[in-house]
UniProtKB/Swiss-Prot annotation:
It comes from Cupriavidus pinatubonensis (strain JMP 134 / LMG 1197). It holds the Pfam family SlyX. Residues 48-60 have a biased composition (Polar residues). Residues 48-67 are annotated as: Disordered. This is Protein SlyX homolog. It comes from the Bacteria. The gene is slyX. Belongs to the SlyX family. HAMAP family: SlyX.
Amino acid sequence: MDDRLNELEIKLAFQEDLLETLNLTVARQQQQLDLLQEQFRALYQQVTSAPSTAAESNPQHEIPPHY
């Protein structure tokens, strides 16, 4: 009976450690997601605030020099 109890306590300790590690990993990933979303919003604002500039700089709309 004592051996089984010790084995269960050891397994529980490992599971608690694993759970803590996984919680830290999830928290870190959430921080990374938040940062990526913030960067995406900033990039989206840049792209949508100047749509005419992108169209004007498109080389397909330029007349070749020999015309």
